[in-house]
């Protein structure tokens, strides 16, 4: 029986989105508490009940912590960027929590993690969006990340 693995950084990205979602939903600014909750979930594979038996899940703890800490440190800048990419008829206060969490983490990695190529960040978070969001939101994520990547490239 062969063992399947999912990329550790991909899992770290999903976990970071979950941590930021928890931060928004619970209005909990205790970053260490949030990270510990999410890490304990992933470190206990028994808590993930719908996985195929031979699928092993582990995350890059360093990447996860770096993403969450970076989002917390840059949250106001990230929200400003997100809100600036909304059309005039969209109210930032009505943005779905999961969409905002995913955008915070993805934009953070795009702007503040220069070792990860923009194309990888866009592909990874579009894939994550595919599993978590509706079709319109997936397109929005892809569009925003693409625009930010192009803007960021011009600034370098």
From Swiss-Prot:
GO biological process, one term: DNA-templated transcription termination
GO molecular function: RNA binding
CDD domains, per the entry: Terminator_NusB
Keywords: RNA-binding, Transcription, Transcription antitermination, Transcription regulation
Regions that span the bilayer: none
Pfam family, one: NusB
Keyword Hydrolase: no
Superkingdom: Bacteria
InterPro entries documented for this protein: NusB-like_sf (IPR035926), NusB_fam (IPR011605), NusB_RsmB_TIM44 (IPR006027)
Gene3D superfamilies from the UniProt entry: NusB-like
Coiled coil: none
GO cellular component labels: cytosol
SUPFAM superfamilies reported for this sequence: NusB-like
Its biological purpose: Involved in transcription antitermination. Required for transcription of ribosomal RNA (rRNA) genes. Binds specifically to the boxA antiterminator sequence of the ribosomal RNA (rrn) operons.
Family: Belongs to the NusB family.
PANTHER family with a match to the protein in the record: ANTITERMINATION NUSB DOMAIN-CONTAINING PROTEIN (PTHR11078:SF3), N UTILIZATION SUBSTANCE PROTEIN B-RELATED (PTHR11078)
HAMAP family recorded: NusB
Entry protein name: Transcription antitermination protein NusB
Species whose genome carries this gene: Rickettsia peacockii (strain Rustic)
Lineage: Bacteria, Pseudomonadati, Pseudomonadota, Alphaproteobacteria, Rickettsiales
